[in-house]
Amino acid sequence: MRVEKTEFTNMCMICDGSRVVVIDRKKQDWSGVTFPGGHVKPGESFTDAVIREVQEETGLKIRSPQLCGIKDWCEDQRRFVVLFYKTTHFEGELRSSSEGEVWWEDIANLPNLKLSLDMNDMLRVFTEEDLSEFFYYQEGSEWKYALK
């Protein structure tokens, strides 16, 4: 089969020197500290979607987000793709939203926080140039992942 149903979302690492914007997500299905982001609306460009989601969740207006990797997996005959972006270009005042509390955090301190599931290894895709994919796969009934 050459066609599969696909759902697109995004995450963005907003950098200011050694600090990054994080959100303590309140959603029960994926709670914990992560980067801001969300769903791509039908017909919306990927870049416009990450700019919109970041502004909705943080109050910051980002510019020039650069695609730096993906997270993907297949489940229930659908593929889920999370587009990873990063940027150093932003303006505005940081503010929390109904999605969760947001703040600037030193990137070196992230492993000490209560991160979202597998966020510590996802961070490697954002920061290591030789990695571009965080791929979940099933082995029997167990979910595993590979960094590629």
Stretch-by-stretch model annotation:
Residues M1-V20:
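Conserved N-terminal beta-strand and adjoining loop/helix that marks the start
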Residues I14, F84-T88, D106:
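Short, well-ordered beta-strand micro-motif
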Residues R19-Q55, S141-K148:
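Conserved Nudix-box catalytic region and its N-terminal flanking loop in Nudix hydrolases
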Residues W73-E93, M122-R124, D130:
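Active-site-adjacent beta-strand/loop module that shapes the phosphate/pyrophosphate-binding cleft
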